[in-house]
Amino acid sequence: MSYWEQRGCGKASQQDAKSVSLLQQVDDLRAILRWLRDETKHTVIVFGISLGATIALRAVENEPDIVKSVIAISPDANTVESDASVYSFFQDQSALARDDRLSGRVKKLGRPPYTDSAAFQGRASLLADLGTIEQGKNFNAILRETLFAMIRTYGLFGTAKALRNMNLIQRKLLPELVSLDLFANPPRLAVPVHYVFGEQDALTLGSIVRRLPATIEAPACTAILVPNAGHMVHFDQPEIVRSIAVSA
């Protein structure tokens, strides 16, 4: 099992964070995969989550001899469709709840696209509070867990750097991600791909769940829509995801 920090993340320098692009993230992952192959002499199973899954699909397309399979958890596939789905979800939830505070937050967020950190984080807060990121956890609970984990890993000063870098990367990547569309130029993989989606994930349309596995070329493919799970399916239903990883 190998973990790594993407370029600009964690305690990296500001220069590293400012150099991030989607293409650079793909190239970095390809370099890591080659390094793992050279070090271990084995092919690897790539486990990617959200945008990380999208990056994995792009990287593995070009490294077929290094990778055994890909597990893609809630991959970002089409930003325009996803943003429209989320906006519609917010409108529906606001009308159903008849909650002035929720309505105010939705109105303040406005229509997509969300190309700055404040809007992106505001949307993330709403998604979490409405139960579509992790079941049973609101934004504050997820934020607390994340901060505690960062402090354990980086210490206080390191966490401050990591949070700074998070904002820098968002500012750099968000405008670029508006045009993200895997359907327009789908990856062509030579290894099996296993897609996992959460049934309560407002970011992923049902049409994307159906279309993505059919669009991306691969010698074998599975796709599962997991009940009682949001965007972070691996946290909500770890046993299901573990069983997929074991057999991948």
Predicted regions and their residues:
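Conserved acidic catalytic loop of the alpha/beta-hydrolase fold
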Residues: 24-44
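Conserved alpha/beta-hydrolase "acid-adjacent" motif
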Residues: 202-208
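Conserved hydrolase catalytic core segment
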Residues: 42-81
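Alpha/beta-hydrolase
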Residues: 97-184, 191
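Short beta-strand/loop motif that positions the catalytic acidic residue
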Residues: 189, 195-197, 201
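A catalytic-pocket lid/entrance helix-loop region that shapes and gates access to the active site
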Residues: 67-112
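Catalytic histidine-centered segment of alpha/beta-hydrolase-like enzymes
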Residues: 229-238, 242
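Conserved alpha/beta-hydrolase
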Residues: 1-13
